[in-house]
C-alpha cells in the first residue's frame, strides 16, 4: 500500500512540474489582449452555435444542472398557494394609488430618496416624462433628471425595458436606452451607474432560435434599496399622468406655460398613436381640434417581505437577459442575491461559464438584515406572475391565472373587476381562448343563484381597445376582433359566461353587470386665441410644439451614451439642427404671445371636466369667452381608458399588477406579468348586504374610493399633490387618505346596498343617454349592424367626438352635461350583435388570432 502511495506521489509530483510552466504562462496571459482574444473567439463560437438551438426548443432545460434547477423551482412552487414560486407573507405595509397624479408624485419622492439601488422594469419608459405637473414649474421632476441626480449621488440604477417589434409598436426602447445611458457621460459623476437592458433580442444572426415577435415584457414595477417597491398598471411613460376629473382639454389662452400635457404626452390612441417618440416634443395631434384620451389606473406601494420577492423577480430577469443577450458583454454584470447564494444561485439565473464576462455583484449592496422587511404592516400578501422560458428562462408559471380563478370561484358576495381587456373562456370549446377565469365566474354565479343569495360580478373595461381608427373601417378589423372576443366571452354564443349561467337555470342578468367609463370637456379655443393667430401669423398648434421644445429640451442627455452609441436625437450635427429648429419655434411662440392684448384676458378655464366631480357648482355658471355657437363646436367627449388591472372580492382580497384579463397575460408563456395578491388582517366594522361584516381595511377602502371616483362623489384634484397623503410613498407616517370626511364614504360602505346600487345604475344610465344624445358616442347599442352607422355617426372624415347636432342650443348642451356625474356608462352589449365583427383576412386568421386574445 505504501509503495503504491509513494509511486502515485512521485507521479503526481512529476505531473505538477510538467504543468507548472503552463499554469504560470496562463496566469501571465490572463489579463492580456491574447487572453481577451481567446475568450472573444470562444464566445463567438458559442454565439454562432446558437443556431443549433433551432432544433432544440428545450435548450435551456435539457442539461443535468438545468433539469435540477427546474425541479427545485417546481418543488418550491408546489408548496405554495396558487403554485406560485413566491410564498405568502404576513407583515406587509401596502398602500394603494388611484390614477397617475398620485402614483407618479409618490414615485418621484421615493426615487429622490434612493441611496443604493433602483430597479425599474417597464413595458415602456419615457425618459422625458414629468412626474409632477405642470411641467414648466417642475423641470427638476422629469424622470431622467431624477435618475441623473441619483446616479451622480452613487446610486446604481438597473432598467429592463421591453424591446418592441418596431413595425408594430412605437415605444422606441432604443431611445430609452440611449437617453438614459447618456445621462452620465464618461469622466462625469455617475458614469456607469445607469444600466439599461432591452429584451427580447430581434437579431436573427445571434438569436435565431429564440426570436419572440408576438409576446412582450409587460411588467411595471420599481424596487428601491430593497426597502420599498411599486407594482401595478402604470408604466413610467407618456399618456399615463392623469387625475380624478380626467380632463380632455389642455388649451391655455393665458399662456402655454400652463400646459399640463406637453408634446407627445398629450395623446389620444383612438385618433392617432404615438409617433417617433424619440422626438418627444413632436405632436401631430392638435390640442385645439381634439381632446386627449384620459387614463385610469391603479398601483400599489409596498414595504415588507414582498419587496424581496419583487426584487428577486427582477434579479432573475436581469440574469436571464444577461445570459440570453449580454453574456459576452462586460458592461453588464451578473447580480447575485443575498439569500440565493451557493447552490441556490441558479434560482435567480446566475451562471458560472468557463470564460465569464462581467463581474458577479452581490445585492443588496448593504446587508439584507438591515432592510427591516419584517413586521411592517398588516397585509398578508403574495407575489404571483406569468412567466416562462422565453421571458425568464423558467418553466411556465401561470400563478396569476390560478389566483384569479380561485379567488373568484370562492367569492361569496361580489367580484369587482377593472381591467384593460376581458377575454376568457368557460371551457375547452372556445379556441383560441384558453384561460378559464370565465368558468370561475360561471361557478360563482350559479352557486349563488341556486342558493338564492345576492351576488354581483361588476366589470369595468374600456369601451374600445386603445388602437387608432374608425371602427367602421377595414383597417380597424384587429380592434374589432378584440371586441368580438370580449363579447363572446361575456354574452354571445352558447359558451359565453351569460349562456353558461343561463344553461344552469340561473338568470345571468341578475348577477353580471358590465360598464365602461367616459369623460367630456370643452376645448378652450377662445376668440382671443384666434385673434392672436391672425395678428402673429402663428397657429396655436405651432406654439404648442414650441412650448414642448422649450421644457422638454434634450440638453440633459449627452451626445452619446456610455456604450458610444446614439439614436436619432443624439450627436453634434443633430444638436445643431435641433438648436436651430428650437430657436425658430421659440421666436414663433414669442410673436404669438406678443400678439396678446390686455383687454383680451380670458375668463374661461382650460378644462371644465371637474364638473363631473363633487362640490364644483353648476356647469351652467361656467364662463365662456365667445359666442354661444362657438362653444357648441368646442365640446368633446372620449372614452376614459381603463388601464387598471385590479380585482377586489368581498371587501377582503385584492389582486393588482400588470396582468390583463386575457390569454396574453394569463397563460404564462405569452406576455410576462407580475401581480400581488393582498388580504388585510386589519379588519374594520362594515356592512355587507345589510348585515354586520368585518371588511379588510385595504380592500374596502380601495373599493370605496374607486366607486366614489366613478360616481363623481370625490372632489377634483389639484396638480400640486405635496400635501396629499395619497401621493406619498408607503410608510407608517403616510397611510392612505380614505376621504371619509363626508357622507359619501358611508354611502358606499355596503357594496350590496340597494340604495347604492340604485344610484350606480341610474347614474350610469343618465350618463350613457347624455353621451348618446349629445355626441352619438361610439360604440352604442343603437349600432347593431354596419348599416346602422350611416344613421348614428356623421360621415367619414368628420371630426369624431364632437357634438353631433351642431345646431343644438348652447344652454341645452350645458344643462344636459350638468346631469353627467362621474364617468360611469353602460357597456353596449348589443353593439354590432347582428354583424360579423371581425372578418377573416390578412389581419385576423388562424395564424394571428392568438395575438388578439
Predicted ranges, named:
Residues 660-666:
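Glycine-rich phosphate/pyrophosphate-binding beta-alpha loops
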Residues 435-443:
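Domain-scale recognition of functional cores that engage charged ligands
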Residues 652:
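Catalytic core of tubulin tyrosine ligase-like
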Residues 2-65:
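Long, serine/threonine/proline-rich intrinsically disordered regions in eukaryotic cortical polarity
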Residues 23, 27, 34, 60-63, ...:
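N-terminal alpha-helical scaffolding segments that mark the starts
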Residues 521, 530-532, 538-555, 609-620, ...:
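Long mid-to-C-terminal assembly/interaction modules of large eukaryotic proteins
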Residues 72-117, 124-407, 414, 418, ...:
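HKD-type phospholipase D/PLD-like phosphodiesterase module
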